[in-house]
Amino acid sequence: MKKLFSRLNTNDRQAIVLVGVNGFFWFAWAFGCYQAVYLQGAGFSASSMGVVNALSSVVGIASVSFWGMASDRMGSLRKVLITVLIGGSLMYALIPLVPVEFRGSPVLLMCYIPAVCFFRSSMSPYAENLLVRNCNELRLNFGVLRSLGSFLFTIGSLIIAAWLPNLGVRNTFWVTGLFMLIPIIMTFFAREPAARVPAKKGEKRSMNLGELFKNKAYMAFLGFGFIFYIAVACEGNFLPYYMASIGVDSKQYGIILALRATMEIPFLLFMIRLRRRFPLRVLILGSSLLMGIECIGLGLLANSLPTMMLFCMFFGLGNGLFIGSSLNYVYELAPSHLKASAQAFFTSMSSVAGILGNLAGGAVFDAIGAKTFYLTVSALFVLSAGVFLLSFKGKRENAEVPGQN
């Protein structure tokens, strides 16, 4: 093994390390996607679930902004990622220890789960940030490396779906933390993306965030993202309740997640070719429309697990497009010294949208029913696409794309 690694150049070794970080992060994440199912089993209604998720989004806003600015000030994305991975994994593993049988249990969970999100909400954004920045700087193929993350998420989802009847939902929390040790260890060996030299002790450094918010393209993307993430929050967080409404066991949720992750792979693999032919904004636009098609299918035609799987394929395709294009879009728009902050504020904006999506979504779901709810969500996806399309007017995007992504 040592001889094999000695023959690899620095970029090849870092590509393997990045797969260990990002790929196995998503493998571990697949085991931790059953929080909604756990709370559903604990007696939480869709409205109560919406409140929990909204509170989590509030904390998420502070989380990604805090860790983003900490990363830029320290000049180290890697240290921040290690911190949030360790903190988020430990606190998430302890969720089943919060009692659910007492009268005050829902309040305890509504306090503890958002607290977990101070770390957990920043785990995936900064794992992705480490990957996209190193891919750009080392001229690695982001689409291929990220597709391995989707592939490993698929494998993890299938494993937990088969294991869940024997394992039990409450044990998925600590299993997630156990598998998260792999990306934590691999992050120690990851390359630190280029950054400013951290400020000396006692030295104050201006972040110049006004430079970021004067960027019209970035602000237009934030506007699109606000509507888009309201729809995403509504679509994803209430899917177990939708499954129950059409007679599908919500414990089959892992199969849906595995299929979606599999469908992300084609667009990620061909992202270089797509970027050579289409501007990033067009790819982002296509992603929201594909997700809207899924919601139309759920609202009009799905009535079983197989038909759900058919339409969820569209969401997977759309998510593959969005993953491959959105991170690089933010990376290209942001100044070199504000890239982590740009990603952090975009993620914070998604959390703000998540608050509205979860609070309103839970109440609307209970009021109008699952089918009509998902038709409404499809309209939000189409609306976000329309708003983003309007921002194209009078602007020309440079279509010349570096070959590394």
For every predicted segment, state its role.
Residues M1-D12, A190-G223:
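Juxtamembrane intracellular "pre-TM" segments in multi-pass secondary transporters
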Residues L4-S57, A217-I246, S250-I256:
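Helix-loop boundary and gating motifs at the non-cytosolic
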Residues A46-S47, N136-L148, S250-K251, S336-F346:
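Loop-to-transmembrane helix entry/capping segments in MFS-fold secondary transporters
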Residues D72-L85, R276-S288:
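Cytoplasmic membrane-interface "Motif A"-like loop-to-helix N-cap segments
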Residues I86-R103, L290-N303:
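C-terminal ends and interior cores of transmembrane alpha-helices
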